Amino acid sequence: MGQNFSKKSGNDLVSRIVFTILILIVCRFGSFIPIPGIDSIALSSVAAQNQSGILGMFNMLSGGSLGRMSIFALAIMPYITASIIIQLMSVAYKPLENLKKEGEVGKRKVNQLSRYLTVLLASFQAYGVAISLESIVTNTGPVVILAGFFFRITTVITLVVGTMLLMWLGEQITQRGIGNGTSLIIFIGIISGVPSAIISMFELSRKGALSPLIAIAVCIGVVVLIAIIIFFERAQRKLLVQYPKRQVGNKIYGGEATHMPLKLNTSGVIPPIFASSILLFPATLANFSNSNSETMGMLTYYLGHGKPVYILLYVALIMFFSFFYTAIVFNSEETANNLRKYGAYIPGKRPGKNTSDYFDYILTRLTVIGGIYLSVICVIPELLMNKYVISLSLGGTSFLIVVNVVLDTMTQIQTYLFSSKYEGLMKKVKLKN
């Protein structure tokens, strides 16, 4: 009976993995379906000229969908942005914060708000894309075959539906598959661009534009970079938490000690994405509007990849968002109150404000190290891309996303296998009894 249970659990895991793979294949197929009214030849020339900047980054996150202007061109980014905005608002807006504390019902309401905001953001972005496409004219002709109201409305509807479909597919993976659906959709998009980036690098090496030694050094550097990311993403500070002893009759219960793990990089991959988006916005605006103003030209130049001003601002923004997002993810005061509620305490620290201040002290030190780690991981590839013209799909942000998603998915699979074995063991014990 125990063997049958174990076999059933194994089959369930396999079916979840197969389901996840099938959904991701659907996402890849959708990224090749173009929106109506686009001249693909003219569009490909525009995409080739905008491989850097925020367009290149979003094209990387969408798995090339933006460059092909497919139905998934906006990718799942409006949903992620909406979720982050709701998260930020829950800190500043008290009713929303109270809603999050209402358990499962409150969680469903917050998710519904995120969906409404996703539709709104996707609509604005889709309309902006439609207007921008209409203004682009290449040597082969305009990108839009027949500009006008009909093209704009069909583009908005198509792109919004594409984003909502991706959001729904991501939720299906989370519920019925394995891993976080949203993260896996971004992951598969980034991975899809890696082969072309490798081919491009070897082509540069073959033509003599890139030294073979440099190409080998880049490959070794990638392995080292992945190892560093794994080390820092797994690194954590464990705080000792003591529970009081309780006497029930003649027996004493409790009194055990446990550990509260605090991640070194609590903010995750959000700071580099936000920092890149802010810094590359002027260049994107100039590209879309075809602006020839001197001010816009200076901004575009100084905020170009690898420029000293860009690097300094990039590091400053990464550090800022590291602290900002860590404060949202980990609420020191709330955690300290929860410990006091259950009678737990940090040895040597009084429950309440003293414990909260201690959490803030530890988190500040961890966030400084985490912010420096994120800055180094993101800045070094930027400098290499600027010097050796390496594809953006090999950037620091993409490495962070890929490694984090792989680690999280592996952890979930291990947890699933462990829980299945535990359930099988408990079933055996019940049968024997």
From Swiss-Prot:
This is Protein translocase subunit SecY. PANTHER family: SECY/SEC61-ALPHA FAMILY MEMBER (PTHR10906). It comes from Rickettsia conorii (strain ATCC VR-613 / Malish 7). Gene3D superfamilies: SecY subunit domain. It is a multi-pass membrane protein. The lineage of its organism: Bacteria, Pseudomonadati, Pseudomonadota, Alphaproteobacteria, Rickettsiales. The chain crosses the membrane at residues 17-37, 71-91, 117-137, 141-161, 184-204, 212-232, 268-288, 310-330, 366-386, 388-408. PROSITE patterns: SECY_1, SECY_2. Keywords: Cell inner membrane, Cell membrane, Membrane, Protein transport, Translocation, Transmembrane, Transmembrane helix, Transport.
